[in-house]
Each structure stands twice: as C-alpha cells, then as structure tokens.
Amino acid sequence: MNSVTVSHAPYTITYHDDWEPVMSQLVEFYNEVASWLLRDETSPIPDKFFIQLKQPLRNKRVCVCGIDPYPKDGTGVPFESPNFTKKSIKEIASSISRLTGVIDYKGYNLNIIDGVIPWNYYLSCKLGETKSHAIYWDKISKLLLQHITKHVSVLYCLGKTDFSNIRAKLESPVTTIVGYHPAARDRQFEKDRSFEIINVLLELDNKVPINWAQGFIY
C-alpha cells in the first residue's frame, strides 16, 4: 500500500499501486473542494471517503456503481450495510438469491466477491441528503471512474436517471449496463436481469463469469 497526504481530513489517503496514475490529480482536486465538503457532517465520515482505493484493480472484471453513499451510516464501501437494514443491498441480495437459489443468508456484500469492485460515483453526501455533494465531487468522480473503466470489462450502473449520460463522461470503451436502482418503484429492479447479463457479456469477452453467491454472509 502507498499513501499520500491531503490538506484536509482525512489528511492521509492510503491506496493500492493500481491507483497510482490518478493520485496526483486526485490530491489536487480534493484540496480544491475539501473545505466546502467538510462544512457538513458527511456520510461516510471523511476517514472513510477513500477506503475503496485500497482495492486492487488489475483483478477486477466488473464495477457495480451506485450514485452516492447511503445518506446515513455510509461505511465507505458502496452498498455495504453491516446490520443488513438498507433497502438497496437487501434488494440486490434478493435478486442474487433468485438467481442462485441461495436463501439462508444474513447479509450480502459486493466487496467480497472475486472480480467485482463496488463503487459510488460521488464519494460522500451531506448527512441525510442524497446527491448533496455532487457539485464538489464531479471532477474527482469522472477521474476515478474513468480509471476504473480502464481495468474492468463491464460497468454496471444502478439508476437509469442518475446514469442516463454516463457513457458521455467516459473516454475508455467499456461495456456499460445502466439498470434500475434497487429502490426503484414498481419493483422494476426485481425484473431487471442485469446480474445474469453481466456474466453473458463476460463469457463473450472470454472472461470468467462472476460467482455472485460469494457475496452472501451467513
């Protein structure tokens, strides 16, 4: 692991070698906006903004991307809910349960699945207010997602409205699926078969499919 210092909390960002090409720009951009961001109480707390930068990228095949953290109790790991109370991760688990037949589980975490990196486009929000920090993170968000897409085969974005123009923001050619948000009304997410489609796309690209059942916690 490597680390860099920034002028505001969290003061030190620890990161895996695979993120090295974007770190100097990340530090520059963060130092520009941090004082604005940190006027608010945030979800997650600043010490957890950059936790996912500890993840390697070279072994990832799929990025599952949400728009921003839970407005309360964000852990820095996208979609993670240690007490398994958040609707988004419960809906994701339910979808994977139908796909895999696994039913006796106590939780689900995308971050423990081989080949998958869960990501949030914006890395924080004001406590209780989704997308409230979008304006501050925008340059950093583009920089980091762009870097991730150089490594993965499939980018799966959850939220048809939030990600309607995501392809225009990306320079690397990456297969992109824009699906329903897990909390979408009329159970649209339930009818969405993106997890299956991702594996078909990986096989077409001669890559190993994702074992989605690995995310279950028992």
From Swiss-Prot:
Catalytic residues identified in the record: D68
Keywords: DNA damage, DNA repair, DNA-binding, Hydrolase
Top-level class of the enzyme under EC nomenclature: hydrolase
Gene Ontology biological-process entries: DNA repair; viral DNA genome replication
Entry GO MF terms: DNA binding; uracil DNA N-glycosylase activity
CDD domains associated with the record: UDG_F1_VAVC_D4-like
InterPro entries per the UniProt record, alphabetical: Ura-DNA_Glyclase_AS, Uracil-DNA_glycosylase-like_sf
EC number: 3.2.2.27
Catalytic reaction list: Hydrolyzes single-stranded DNA or mismatched double-stranded DNA and polynucleotides, releasing free uracil
Effect of P173G: About 50% loss of interaction with OPG148
Family in the record: Belongs to the uracil-DNA glycosylase (UDG) superfamily. UNG family.
Quaternary assembly: Homodimer. Interacts with protein OPG148. Component of the Uracil-DNA glycosylase(UDG)-OPG148-polymerase complex; OPG148 and UDG form a heterodimeric processivity factor that associates with OPG71 to form the processive polymerase holoenzyme.
Biological role: Plays an essential role in viral replication as a component of the DNA polymerase processivity factor. Excises uracil residues from the DNA which can arise as a result of misincorporation of dUMP residues by DNA polymerase or due to deamination of cytosine.
Name the UniProt record assigns to this protein: Uracil-DNA glycosylase
Species whose genome carries this gene: Vaccinia virus (strain Copenhagen) (VACV)
Name of the gene this protein is made from: OPG116
